[in-house]
Swiss-Prot record:
Autocleaves itself into an N-terminal fragment containing the protease activity, that remains in the capsid following maturation. The record marks 141-142 as: Cleavage. Belongs to the P2likevirus scaffolding protein family. It comes from Escherichia phage P2 (Bacteriophage P2). Keywords: Coiled coil, Hydrolase, Protease, Serine protease, Viral capsid assembly, Viral capsid maturation, Viral release from host cell. Residues 206-243 form a coiled coil. GO terms for molecular function: serine-type peptidase activity. Transmembrane segments: none annotated. Pfam families: Phage_GPO. InterPro entries: Capsid_scaffold_GpO (IPR009228). It comes from the Viruses. Its EC number is 3.4.21.-. The active site is at residues 19, 48, 107. This is Capsid assembly scaffolding protein.
Length: 284
């Protein structure tokens, strides 16, 4: 099954957080500028809860792939505010929840001084069902509470958690590569439940055969493409050579023609001054 990637959707807007602090337009822009999954990957969790079991309800539900910052330009009350937009690569469970109209809001976890850079970074993205749990009513409680109840959900106490934002997720297939296609094929083979060692050995043999056939198929296709490129290059080389010869011959003909053509700017010899010039003398 091909992996999915979402289109860009809004995950947060400048404004209040759940502890009374404010996310500024600069914070939004910094998160878009600094985000790099190779430096720190931002994973998607449920209700800002990070479970440790891969099969538990609070497992991870995908990753943030890209971020961008844009000003909102619509007829809503948010017009003119800076917003953060994300592309995500979801798990099948998140896609299923979204199709069932569950967990349709997002809430950001922001680290203000990420890695001592002095800039904000998106370190977590939660999906939630009820905006009130991270919205106005909950916001007021967190402002006045002696101990912020959200602190236990944060990676660091100084991190900010944004008010939840409703989202509409649209997914598209990621292009399938040779590696992903082969991986899925082998995984499907080893995913079968077998009772005996002979059956497992057969699975290993089938997997090795599948790998060999897949590699051979891709090598043959690559060789064919290389042969086509070589043929095209040879034809192009011959065409360039022919044109160069034609140009050289044309230049030689032009040079020879010019060498045998009298120059109109060349100085002429003056007429002879002896005798009477053009007069004819008669001896009488």
């Amino acid at each position: 099954m091909a992996k999915k990637v979402s289109k860009f959707f809004r995950i947060g807007v400048e404004g209040d957080t759940c502890d009374g602090r404010v996310i500024s337009a600069q914070d939004i822009q910094e998160m878009a500028e600094t985000f790099d999954p190779r430096v720190y990957g931002c994973r998607i969790n449920l209700e800002h809860l990070r479970g440790i079991l891969p099969d538990g309800i609070f497992k991870r539900y995908g990753d943030v792939a890209e971020l961008k910052a844009e000003k909102i330009d619509d007829d809503s009350a948010l017009k003119g505010k800076w917003a953060l937009f994300a592309k995500i690569t979801p798990t099948d469970d998140l896609i299923a929840m979204n199709k069932a109209a569950q967990k349709v809001y997002t809430s950001m976890e922001i680290q203000p001084n990420f890695a001592n850079t002095g800039k904000c970074y998106l370190v977590g993205l939660a999906v939630t069902d009820d905006p009130a749990s991270l919205g106005t009513e909950y916001l007021e409680f967190c402002r006045t509470a002696k101990h912020n109840p959200l602190n236990r959900f944060k990676l660091s106490p100084e991190n900010l958690i944004s008010v939840a934002t409703p989202v509409e997720l649209e997914f598209e297939d990621l292009p399938e590569t040779v590696f992903t296609a082969l991986t899925e094929k082998v995984k499907s083979i080893f995913g079968r439940k077998q009772a005996s060692d002979d059956a497992r050995l057969n699975d290993v043999h089938e997997a090795v055969t599948a790998v060999a056939e897949h590699v051979q198929e891709k090598l043959s296709a690559t060789e064919q493409r290389l042969a086509e490129m070589e043929t095209a290059f040879s034809a192009l080389k011959q065409e360039v050579t022919d044109r160069a010869d034609e140009t050289s011959q044309a230049f030689t003909r032009l040079k020879n023609s010019l060498d045998h053509t009298e120059s109109l700017t060349q100085q002429r010899r003056s007429k002879a001054t002896g005798g009477g010039g053009d007069a004819l003398m008669t001896n009488c």
